[in-house]
Each structure stands twice: as structure tokens, then as C-alpha cells.
Curated annotation (Swiss-Prot):
Organism: Xenopus tropicalis (Western clawed frog)
Name of the protein in question: Vacuole membrane protein 1
Domain comment quoted from the record: The VTT domain was previously called the SNARE-assoc domain. As there is no evidence that this domain associates with SNARE proteins, it was renamed as VMP1, TMEM41, and TVP38 (VTT) domain.
A single BP term in Gene Ontology: lipoprotein transport
Compartment(s) of residence: Endoplasmic reticulum-Golgi intermediate compartment membrane; Cell membrane; Vacuole membrane; Endoplasmic reticulum membrane
Amino acid sequence: MAENGTDCEQRRVGMAKEQNNGSFQDPSFLSDRKSRDREERQSIVLWRKPLITLQYFILEVLITLKDWSIRLWHRRMMVVSVLLLLAVLSVVYYIEGTHQQYVQYVEKKCLWCAYWVGLGILSSVGLGTGLHTFLLYLGPHIASVTIAAYECNSVNFPEPPYPDEIICPDEEGTEGAISLWTIISKVRLEACMWGAGTAIGELPPYFMARAARLSGVETDDEEYAEFEEMLEHAQTAQDFATRAKLAVQNLVQKVGFLGILACASIPNPLFDLAGITCGHFLVPFWTFFGATLIGKAIIKMHIQKLFVIITFSKHIVEQMVSLIGVIPSIGPSLQKPFQEYLEAQRKKLHHKEDSGAPQSENWLSWAFEKLVIIMVFYFILSIINSMAQSYAKRVQQRKLSVEKTK
């Protein structure tokens, strides 16, 4: 009797396990489960669940630090070599001598390049939201240089305070000496570094898709899962967005280097798909990154620079301000702050340290500064939410694995 009872219990457990495994193998069940899990993760944000979000964020940070510590330990010889190199550079940096002028020059250029590369990476990677650093930093910088160049008739701004502050040089430039190419050359370094940063930011989708294809293991990345689903239903795609994505995928897959170059050179929101496509179809790294770097850091950046420089050239700006005044009823009142802002900028360009009281701040510049602060603050919040949701995904995957083994 006892043996029969034991056999019945084993059969009951086995049947339950088979039924459970069958549920997990059902595509509709898995799809519904993924949808529920995704909705649950998306609800973990600071303004809905602040305590859980902060807790998950801290745990995800600790896990990330642990993973990086393990990776660095496995590459300890390289870490030691880098530390020795930094020690030698520190000695060279702090020892007095005639070489200090070159050290200061290299330090200034390296920090300047690193700043713009970092902003480019932030703009490209985004971590869930994207910090549009071209609109917030590079675009206004190019616009300021353009306005200053036409006002000063020169781009030889005193260093310092340039690039932190732009003032006209002591010697007056010749009227009409400024050309489009002069301004392009002045801002070429920072623009190319920003473009290189955006190219570097496109690498994570490429490496993720490539690793998933080579390993044959189903990835947990939602964008890659959507890409595979799009390929499966390519023949039945009806909506414009899906057809546009398929067009980008076909261009990159069939044309190769030139197709990637074309996608990277033209501002478009679908280039992330190009990185996933290249990784999925095992496009060589240097083919993908080389085309992306040339397209974003050279071709696309020159297009964007030309647009900003032409838009903020002296006669265009004056025409735009005059056109604002033509707007019925609100035109004159709306035109006044723009005129005051431009006049304040002209005075600031000719302002010297010993020229009296500082200039009063215009409300347009004040509003733009507050907009930048709000955007950066929102970006930080999005990072916290994104990392908290990443930890929630770990918890869901762990729970799913336990359920599969029952």
C-alpha cells in the first residue's frame, strides 16, 4: 500500500511537472508572461514606487560594481599596466620643467576632447531616454561661435577665457573677413569628437546582437526580440514604421559598408536598428564601426554644423528677429526680448574684465539654463529608473527559472 501511494505521488508530481513545462513551451503563454513582466517593470519608477525603485537601483549598482570588479580581476595584468602608465604620467605632470607648457597644452586638448566624446556617448546611448546633447551643448556652442565670429570679424578669441567664455580679441578684424569655412574650421575638433562619441554609443546594440547570434542563446534584450519578430513577419508588414525599419535593414544587409555609411550620415531615428542588423548578420566590426565613425563624425557633423552656422549667421538672425515683429498683436512684445538678448551678447563679446559692472542676465539665457538643468535632472532620473527596472528583470528571470525547474 505504501509503495502504491509513493508511486501515485511520484506520478502526480511528474504529471504536474510535465503540465508546467508544457505551459512554458506554449508560445502564447510565454508571450503573455513577457507582456505582464514588461508592464510590471515599467511601473517601477521613482514617481510611482520610490522606495522599491531606489532599493532596486542600489542593488543593481552593487551587482554592476561586482561584475566589473570580477572583470578587472581577470584582466589584472592590463590593469597593472594601466596603473603604471598613469603613475609615470603623474610624475611627468607634477615635475617642474620646460616641458610643462606642452603638458598643459596636451591636458587642455585631452580634457576638451573627452568632454565632447562623453556628451556624444550620452546622446547616443541614452540609457532609456537619451540626453540630446547636440541641442543642449554642441548646437548652442556652434551658434555662439558663429555670432561671435561675425561680431568680432575674427575667430582668434583669447585663450583663456575661450572656450569657457567668448570675447573679441584686442585687434579688430577686417569687415567681411569671416567665411563659412573659417567658422567650420574653428569648431571642427569639438564637433568631430561629439560625432565620434555618438559612434561609440552605437556599439552596445551591435555587440549584443552579435553575441546573441554567435551563442545561439535567446537574448533578454527587448529591442533585439522586436527585431527578430520583425524579421519573422517581414512579408506581412503593413504599417509605415515597420516598412521603414525593414528598408534600413535591407539597405544595411545588402549594400554593406556604403549602406551603413548612408544610414549614419543622414540624421534618422532608426540607426539603432542598423547596429542590431549588423550584429545579427555578423558584419565585421571594422566595417560597421568604420562606416559609422566616418558617417557620424565627419559627414553628418558637417551637415549639422552647416545648418547651425547658416541659421545663426548675422543676416539670417537679424531677418528672423525682424520677422518675429511682423506677427500680429504679440509680435513687438515677443521681438523685444530677442533684440535685448542679441544686444547683450554683442556687449558681452566686447566686455573686458576691467570694463565696469557685469552685464545683467537676459531672461532668455536664464530660461535656457533652467531648461538644461531640467533635462539633466530628468536624464539622471531615467538612469535610476532604468537600472531599477534592470534589477526587476533579474528578479523576474530568477523566478521564471525556479518555476521551470519545479
